[in-house]
Structures are given as structure tokens and as C-alpha cells.
Amino acid sequence: MAKLGVNIDHVATIRQARGGVEPDPVAAAALAELAGADGITIHLREDRRHIQDRDLKLLRQTVKTKLNLEMAATAEMVAIALSVKPDMCTLVPEKRQELTTEGGLDVRIAMQGIAEAVERLQNGGIAVSLFVDPDPDQVKASSKVGSDYIEIHTGAFADAKDWKSEQDELERIGNAIKLGAKLGLGINAGHGLNYTNIRKVAALGGIEEYNIGHSIISRAVLVGLDRAVRDMVDLIKYA
């Protein structure tokens, strides 16, 4: 059965809006795990707009399932990861002005730098995933640089405006899953997935873990984090 990694970045976003200490992402992570999450995902951005270094260190000490650190492939972030030792690092592109990650890594353009980051992290005992668009060239490049996993960027599917566009994106995702598996890559997926569209992606099969944040935290505001996580776990489990 596919697993659920809950991204708690937006718990930190709410905290940072007032510059205080609440809500606490560490407490949110514990509640998510108790509700059935198989892992906790955070993105330590270079501008520290939500998750802070202290959060990462505390989460490493408290997370009982799996800690997945999303990060840019920079020397600073690699050094932090090697110090803290999350279970997995997912390398993502980063732009200072974006509200959220807007697309996948262009692994083909930056193969040398990404390959070096992948090697350093793996030598430190950390599994590595690359966040890529469902593009066969990017999947192949991810394999060439030695990544353990890819996380397929599902944003274009989530943003599709009509049935035809949605089906086209599902086909792209399905093809990326098959190619990645053929190349020996583990397959994760995320971005824009919610309670309405998750089953369509889950029906494709072949995905080991979904990393979902915004929709779960949004629902948690209305029904509580425990129920929000349990509802998503059920959707994935019974897809």
C-alpha cells in the first residue's frame, strides 16, 4: 500500500505570520504520526520563510516514522542535511519570489552539481529523491546522477482546467512511473494533490509515497489535524 508523507510547512507559515511560537510544527508532526502518517516532510528554504533550522533539529529528534527534508542542492543545505541526518532528502528547485515550488528540477541542465549533492548525501547514509516533472528525459537524468528515488511533480495534473488536459497529465505521470520503475528508481509523487484528485493518481499504481501538505493543513483548520490526516490516509488506502 502506498504511504502518506505529511508536509507541515504551512503550520510553520502560520506561526511565522505572527513571529511567535504557535502553532508548533513539532507538535503537528507528532499529531500527524498518531493519526497514521507514514512520514513527515519539511522544506528548509534558503530564505527560511517557514521552517527554521531549529524545527529541523527538533523534528529529527522527535519524528518516529520517516523525516523527509526538501531542500535546494546547495553546499549550505547539503552540509545541514549531513549534520542533521534526515532519513531522506528530496532535492527541489528554489526561487526566492515563488509562493511554492513551481516546477521540477531540470536535472539535465545541472547534472554535475546535482550528482555531487546526491553522492555526498548518500555517502552520509541519506536516501535521495529528485523532484522532477513527469518528463522521460528528466527521469532518465535522475537515474544517471544516481538518485534513489524520484518524486513526480503532479502540479500540472492538479491545475488542469479540463478533462482532456487532466487525462493527458495522468498519462504523462503513468509513463514516468513505468520508466522510473524500469530504471530501478523508487517513485514518490506530490504537489497540488488533495482530497478530490488523489484517487485519480493513486489508481495509476506504482507510487510508493505521496507527499501532501497544503490540502491537509487547510482541511485541518476546519476539522482538526487528526481527522484531516486520517481522511487522506483512507483515500490512499482504499484508492
From Swiss-Prot:
Keyword Lyase in record: no
GO biological process, one term: pyridoxine biosynthetic process
Entry superkingdom: Bacteria
Enzyme Commission number: 2.6.99.2
Top EC group: transferase
Keyword set includes Nucleus: no
Positions contributing to 1-deoxy-D-xylulose 5-phosphate binding: 9-10, 45, 50, 100
Signal sequence region: none
Location of this chain's protein in the cell: Cytoplasm
Principal subcellular localisation of the protein: cytoplasm
Keywords: Cytoplasm, Pyridoxine biosynthesis, Transferase
Pathway named in the protein's UniProt entry: Cofactor biosynthesis; pyridoxine 5'-phosphate biosynthesis; pyridoxine 5'-phosphate from D-erythrose 4-phosphate: step 5/5
Catalytic activity: 3-amino-2-oxopropyl phosphate + 1-deoxy-D-xylulose 5-phosphate = pyridoxine 5'-phosphate + phosphate + 2 H2O + H(+)
Sites annotated Transition state stabilizer: 151
Primary role: Catalyzes the complicated ring closure reaction between the two acyclic compounds 1-deoxy-D-xylulose-5-phosphate (DXP) and 3-amino-2-oxopropyl phosphate (1-amino-acetone-3-phosphate or AAP) to form pyridoxine 5'-phosphate (PNP) and inorganic phosphate.
Family: Belongs to the PNP synthase family.
Quaternary structure annotation from Swiss-Prot or TrEMBL: Homooctamer; tetramer of dimers.
PANTHER family assigned: PYRIDOXINE 5'-PHOSPHATE SYNTHASE (PTHR30456:SF0)
The name this protein goes by in its record: Pyridoxine 5'-phosphate synthase
Organism (species): Geobacter metallireducens (strain ATCC 53774 / DSM 7210 / GS-15)
Gene: pdxJ
